[in-house]
C-alpha cells in the first residue's frame, strides 16, 4: 500500500541519516581538527599556564605525587585541580550523552563541541598567573575530557585525540599482527594510528612554539581549529 511504501522510505531515510552521522563523527578530517586541538591545548597549558598538562593527566599525577612527597602542598594542588576537572569533564560528557542521545533536532556531540568552545573562550579572557591559572587549567582540562570522551573512533578504529600512548600501543600491535597474519587491513589500521600521533605532534609543536610569543590569547586560536558543531553529528 502507499502508506507502507512511505513508511519503508522513511525507515531507509532514517538509517541513511544515522550512517551519515556516524561517518561524520569518525572522518579523518574531524580527527585531524580534534587531534591538533588536543596537542595545542597541552602545549598552551604547559608553557603559558604554569607547566600543567590539560590532557596528560598521568604527567600531572606524577608531578602532584612528587610535590606531595616533598611536602609542597600548594604546588601539589596545582596539579590535582586539572586531574579532578578532567574527571568531571568525562562525567559531564557522559551525562550530556545520556540526556540528548535521543533528541532529534540536535546531536549530543554538537552540544559537546559548543560547550568546549565556550570553555576555551572563557580561558582566553582569564589573566595569567597565580590563582587565575588554577581556574584556567581546570576549564581547559574539563574541555579536553569532554572531547576525548565524546570522539573515540576514526574510520571505525578506537583512538584518543588528546593523548598518544593508546594510539602508539594500537599502532604497534597492528603492525605485529600484520607481520604474523599478512592482512593488509591491519597495516592500514597501524598507519591510521601513526597519522593520529603525527597530527598530535604537529599540534603540540605549533602550540609550544607560538604560545610563548602570543601568550594568553593563543588559546583563542584553538577556536579556529575546533570543528564546526554541524560537522560532528
PLM regions: where:
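Alpha-helical transmembrane segments of multi-pass membrane proteins
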Residues: 13-226
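Single conserved hydrophobic/aromatic residue that forms the stacking wall/gate
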Residues: 1-11, 224-233
Amino acid at each position: 500500500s502507499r502508506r507502507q511504501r512511505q513508511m519503508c522510505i522513511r525507515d531507509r531515510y532514517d538509517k541513511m541519516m544515522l550512517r551519515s552521522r556516524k561517518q561524520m563523527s569518525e572522518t579523518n578530517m574531524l580527527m585531524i581538527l580534534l587531534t591538533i586541538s588536543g596537542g595545542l591545548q597541552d602545549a598552551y597549558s604547559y608553557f603559558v599556564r604554569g607547566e600543567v598538562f590539560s590532557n596528560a593527566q598521568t604527567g600531572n599525577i606524577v608531578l602532584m605525587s612528587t610535590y606531595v612527597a616533598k611536602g609542597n602542598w600548594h604546588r601539589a594542588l596545582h596539579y590535582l585541580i586539572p586531574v579532578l576537572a578532567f574527571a568531571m569533564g568525562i562525567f559531564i560528557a557522559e551525562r550530556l550523552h545520556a540526556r540528548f542521545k535521543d533528541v532529534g533536532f540536535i546531536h549530543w556531540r554538537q552540544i559537546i563541541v559548543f560547550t568546549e568552545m565556550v570553555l576555551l573562550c572563557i580561558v582566553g579572557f582569564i589573566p595569567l598567573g597565580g590563582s587565575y591559572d588554577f581556574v584556567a587549567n581546570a576549564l581547559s582540562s574539563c574541555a579536553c575530557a569532554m572531547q576525548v570522551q565524546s570522539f573515540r573512533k576514526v574510520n571505525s578504529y578506537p583512538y584518543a585525540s588528546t593523548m598518544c600512548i593508546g594510539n602508539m600501543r594500537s599502532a604497534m600491535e597492528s603492525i605485529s599482527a600484520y607481520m604474523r597474519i599478512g592482512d593488509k587491513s591491519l597495516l592500514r589500521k597501524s598507519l591510521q594510528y601513526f597519522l593520529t600521533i603525527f597530527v598530535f605532534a604537529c599540534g603540540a609543536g605549533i602550540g609550544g612554539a607560538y604560545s610563548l610569543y602570543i601568550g594568553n590569547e593563543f588559546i583563542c586560536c584553538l577556536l579556529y581549529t575546533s570543528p564546526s558543531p554541524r560537522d560532528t553529528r
